[in-house]
Amino acid sequence: MAEIKSEETSEKKSLNFIEQIVENDLKEGKNGGKVQTRFPPEPNGYLHIGHAKAICLDFGIAAAHGGVCNLRFDDTNPTKEDVEYVEAIKEDIQWLGYKWGNEYYASDYFQQLWDFAIRLIKEGKAYIDEQTSEQIAAQKGTPTQPGVESPYRNRPIEETLDLFQKMNSGEIEEGAMVLRAKIDMASPNMHFRDPIIYRVVKHPHHRTGTTWKAYPIYDFAHGQSDFFEGVTHSLCTLEFVPHRPLYDLFVDWVKEGKDLDDNRPHQYEFNKLNLSYTLMSKRNLLTLVKEGLVNGWDDPRMPTICGFRRRGYSPESIHKFIDKIGYTTYDALNEFALLESAVREDLNDRATRVSAVLNPVKLIITNYPEGQVEEMEAVNNPEHPEEGNHVIEFSRELWMERDDFMEDAPKKYFRMTPGQEVRLKNAYIVKCTGCKKNDAGEITEVYCEYDPDTKSGLPGANRKVKGTIHWVSCAHCLEAEVRLYDRLWKVENPRDELAAIREAKNCDALTAMKEMINPDSLNVLPCCYIEKYAAGMQPLSYLQFQRIGYFNVDKDSTPEKMVFNRTVGLKDVWGKINK
């Protein structure tokens, strides 16, 4: 699969700080002049848009310098991992336009990591601790106070080796003991205070089955896996800055006694993606799915890549957004409106224009011949005239938007109202003559007369009319379901709000999330009408419903009834609300 190019390919864009580091390394001839990166997801959930930012950097850096980016699954926690997530992650990366060099798993290195741990024990650099997790945490100290050494810190090497073997044989229960690296309990870096590097997990692994019972901790597996693979630039988000000295120390230990100034991985950190009105914790996203607050991982309200895909975002729109926000060394909250702006910009270029009526009322042209049908020309995409036109049928009875009619309209109302002319897009100029109501006072029909000399394309069509509305022919359209999606959360910063609610009310995350959910995040319109040109369009087809917004064909569509998802409106409604 070809990689998707940035929107700035026509001119040299300024380099972000990581690109500058890589270029300087190449100029200095480091790492033998090669660049190798990796994207290391844990297969315990679906990728979200925050991962997309990391993916674009990992793969983009490698591609820009003739290097390779490998995919490595960090599968060191078998209780939360599943093959389902592995396959979904691969699909998302490919959809974003990237192809990895090699596919690796941390479990590929379980034996090497085990052997390394054995070596550390023999060198007196690791020991088995039988304290509880609470006791170990209490002995860690604080950033301003040194920790307290474990009473097991100096246990005999042979005893530690024997217990470590028992951890993996199944003789030791989960939580009964751990293997800790012996570093410095007085270090100002809390991660150096004898970190846990192995623990017991009695759960089958999705690749290795029950071969292993003792599993390495992420900090122990990460740097060594990078080293085993030949990674040159290990790119992480900012929360891993305090982990970097430990990363370097373990790499020093694994190749102790050899020259490590070159051909070794170096960790660099960049800011993660924080997005307003968005919660990206996998734990919380999993809760939403399990509790039925959303309709699966690919619910179009979810911040997952598959959710955005189903909603109608294109890979290019996500690339545009990430190009705009860039990479820095400080965290910031990015506006969701900026993401939507990138989506609008992209879909304006690629979406096919069609007419659809979401809140229909019948419009009858009283002086139009009964039984007559005309074929009008509609432009597929004004941004790309080469894509041509399509036919939209016109007849005496049409569906129009209920919001496009007012019986008693104010002076500056330019749509359908008695005595006023309006243009029917791609068709004629008509004058409204009245309406019909039911016993409840609801408008059921609108009446108008057309001017046959004002057909689109004829000289008479040039007559100035301020209002233009869209329509579909009652006899030549499809009934469809339209799902109007909006932001899932009603608060700008749901991560902080979640923590605040939980603290204030002493409640669990689910209770707090229910309080924050936007009740208008999904509005299903079961009876809408769309021109029949849309019939047979495949799921993920990009459309603009003229005058309404951008929409996408949903996978729930059937030959009998199509389903469309609103991707984004034509304008930023939330931005106006918040001003």
For the regions a protein language model found, what residue spans apply to each?
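Basic/polar N-terminal segments that are highly enriched at the extreme N-terminus
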Residues: M1-K13, K579
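N-terminal catalytic cores of NTP/NDP-binding nucleotidyl/phosphoryl-transfer enzymes
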Residues: K13-E23, K27-K90, H206-T237
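Residue-level signal for inorganic ion chemistry
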Residues: G29, D58, I89, L120, ...
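Conserved short loop/turn motifs at secondary-structure junctions
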Residues: P40-P43, R72-K80, N102-Q111, E134, ...
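Active-site cores that bind ATP or allylic diphosphates and position pyrophosphate for catalysis
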Residues: L71, D75-N77, V83, Y105, ...
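A glycine-rich helix N-cap at a beta->alpha junction
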Residues: Y85-Q111, F116-R119, G124-Y127
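Core subunits and conserved enzymes of cellular information-processing
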Residues: F240, R244, D248-F250, E316-H319, ...
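Long, charged, mostly alpha-helical binding arms that flank functional sites
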Residues: D262-A342
